[in-house]
Amino acid sequence: MRKILFGIFLTLNTVLSCIAQQKFEPLPMDPALRYGILDNKLTYYIRHNETEKERADFYIVQNVGAILEEDSQNGLAHFLEHIAFNGTKNYPGKGIINYLETIGVKFGANINAYTSLDETVYNLKAVPTYRSGIVDSCLLILHDWSSFISCEDDEIDKERGVILEEWRTRNTSDRRLWKKSSQILYEGSQYAKRDIIGDTAIILHFHPDSLRAYYKKWYRPDLQGIIIVGDVDVDYVENKIKEIFADIPERVNPATRIVYDLKKLDTTKVCILTDPEAKYTIGNITYRHDAMPSEIYASIVGYTTSVIDNLISKMVNARIDEVLKEKDCPFSYASMSYGSQVKSCDGYELMYVVKDNRCMEASEKILSLAEQVRRYGFTESELYRAKETTIASFEKAYTERTKAKNNSFVGEYKRNFTTFEPIPGIEWEFDAIKKILPSITTDIVNKRFADYFKTNQITVLMTAADKDKNLLPSENQLTQLIADREKIAASPYIDKAKNKPLVKKDPKPGKIVDIYHNPKLDYTMWTLSNGAKVIIKSTKLKNDEILMTAFSEGGISTVGDLSILSSAKIADNIIEANGLGDFDATQLDKALAGKNVTVSPSIAMYESKISGRSTIKDFKTMLQMTYLLQTSARKDPEAYASLMSQYETVLENRSADPMNDYRDSVQVLSSSRNSYTMPFKKENLSEVNEADAIKIFKSLFYCPEKFTYIFVGNLAEDSVKNEILSYIGGIKSSKSKQRGWIDRGIKHPSGFTKCEFSKTLSTPKSADYFSYMTDMEYNLKNKLQLAILRSILDYRYLESCREREGGTYGVAVRQSMSVVPTSSACLKIAFDTDPEKEALLSKIVKEEIDIIIKDGVRDDDFQKAKEALQKSFAESLLENGYWKGQLEHLEKYGWCDNPTYTETLAKITKEDIRQTLKTIVDAGNLLEIKMKPNK
């Protein structure tokens, strides 16, 4: 690694002056950040940010994780994370959650934590800060999580079942393969022994003192970082941190926080694994290197190296994207990236999803792409595009620096604490990138790429389904392929970019024939001469963001011929894969390099839609792409064949995952087995025809008179008028007589419907689904009552099914309302559990509903639910996406939330909620689906 860094250092010393004199000086810290270390060695980061008015995020980062467990503690780092929510010195029992939910901060969405191998992080997000007492309380919670978690015996015993159910839910094929591969590829290191969730036998039987020992040993201020970002008084918060955390002493003779190494390999390490529920055959080739020393990583040399690595990643993956579009490409997806493997080890990783069991061919192909770059290097045009894309992303971040969200800062500060990532701030970074990029040459990136492969620490992993075991290559074959890498055929790359305008000839502009202004919601609507409606709402919520949505009634429901239904279902993906106008998809990607713009079509059952996003500078490009979508969809047999091949790979082993049968059952039965909503499967591919898909797409999108185009963001009507008239008004009207959606009989089943089936499962579990449906008028009050009901059921199921019974990791409750084809409401409930507990939990789920109908809603649940909705509403007002959705809703249904939301919410009573639930249940339309393991 030192040779690699020294090579970069020498190459860049003509680019970056005085590096030698700096002796790897760390980059400056963002001056807008308040950073400090208390006498007890606790680190804190505080930043004032008003983007989210009267909101702040509070984090405590523990620079320890499962990797530090002793063998007898396997799984206890994660267990402790759970116990932290079950009682602390100042918040006994469920005090943390109960208090925070009274101010609208919800468990799960805003109150959460995670444990990884090397860190454990607790967070309180979007906390209201309109009272200093709330800030004090959140700091006290962080204080308790630091050193005063109660770890009471009874709470530990109750949580054992919850952890076991989390294991049951998360023990998927991917996780099993990851665990097995870690044991082999990381053999001889601590990383081979730990998997976070841990040993279930230990989880069920460990003595509470073992958990307390882990807590006492590793949760200490020198390994903890406090992060507070948001609408707070920085001086006040800093003083409160010093005051509140003063009672935590510096640890005397603390245990060393070891950074574990990986065992050095004597030869290429190959690991081939299968699992009965694996859906894909996946290859992974990694060239390991020692991690960059932290003092270099935090310096200008480390920063510049990261810039070079990112440029390489962009260029290599652009080449992969080209290859993926080839008809005979042996993999359906692939990527190459350089990054951290574990704390002590970086690596260059080649990942690919194999098509049609062509394992050796796919492995050789991905290596040939790497060899192509290593031997012949990158072209000037590729580097130019990568630089343009990079500078565009930095420019966007710089322009939006006063509108950045709290979580963007939190992520940077967390990585600074755990990995020493520099945090100089976007002002410094934007200035630096403008100086660094022009001086990075193809020679520099080519040298860096070649150095990726100068290591003998190589691992190869291939995973697949059990049924494909005999089709996999041997370890010897893969080892030999790596050894013979330099013999693989590779030819120089030919860049086939098109240097021409997106739109060959600008269309004749349309005219505005009618103007309407809505003063309440402050938007303007134009009706254009081609029949299109355009809605514009100017906001300053973001400095450089414009969102677009264009929608039309119709969608898949307009397709009457069932023989072309499969073509209709994936027509939008076919159009995107084929490119637009004179540009195939690869050429289009290259033409858009350096532009912050996305435009994509979608076809739902009852509507067709175009979604877009751009900066101010790239607004015209967004309109041009929209124009091309609605005038210039193209046929591309090779791209189409490649897409079909990718679909085949995805769908081939779809049934291997037993949860797909469960999800399919929900989809099929929820719509009464309607042909239009059947899951898309491999056999449907033979029904797809490119010409049919394009014809369907044109019938749905080549009709501007049926579309309403909504633009929300930092745009002024006068500045965008001419471009809208050209690229929206210039789309020719159609002569289609089709108007709106068609009722195809898709409906929730009436009465009681039950489906119970069994599957062979690697991890025994039962999965239950309940869906209650009733006719209900679609209005704001009913919509809010359903949202409140969902939260109330969330609270009750958390208390009964998870906390009291330890029977499930969580009960998912969802509510929905439909207008098309009929106005209705649906309440959906789902959970996974131990098969032995399924009957009990199923009974509890229904009992909780019966209790609410009989006894009414608990007052504290009701108030918490309403407070959370009001808080969420206030936050949504600061998002362009919210306003875009509101204007779309208004145009479709004649009303939207905004004008009367708070007033309507305030008037809802507990009796309203009880009656709403009673109405849903009394309708008698219950769909019940149960999947159980084969005995």
Q: What is each of the regions a protein language model found here?
A:
Residues 45-47, 52-69, 76-77, 94-144, ...:
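M16 family metallopeptidases and their MPP-like homologs
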Residues 81-85, 576:
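Active-site-flanking alpha-helical
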Residues 205-242, 677-679, 685-726:
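Internal metal/ion-chelating core segments
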Residues 18-46, 233-298, 302-307, 313-317, ...:
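Proteolytic maturation boundary segments
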Residues 155, 160-223, 227-229, 234-241, ...:
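Hydrophobic, small-residue-rich alpha-helical packing segments that form membrane-like cores
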Residues 78, 310, 568-569, 787:
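Proteins synthesized as precursors that undergo proteolytic processing into mature forms
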Residues 1-22:
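Bacterial Sec-dependent N-terminal signal peptides
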Residues 99, 148-156, 169, 440-448, ...:
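Peptidyl-prolyl cis-trans isomerase
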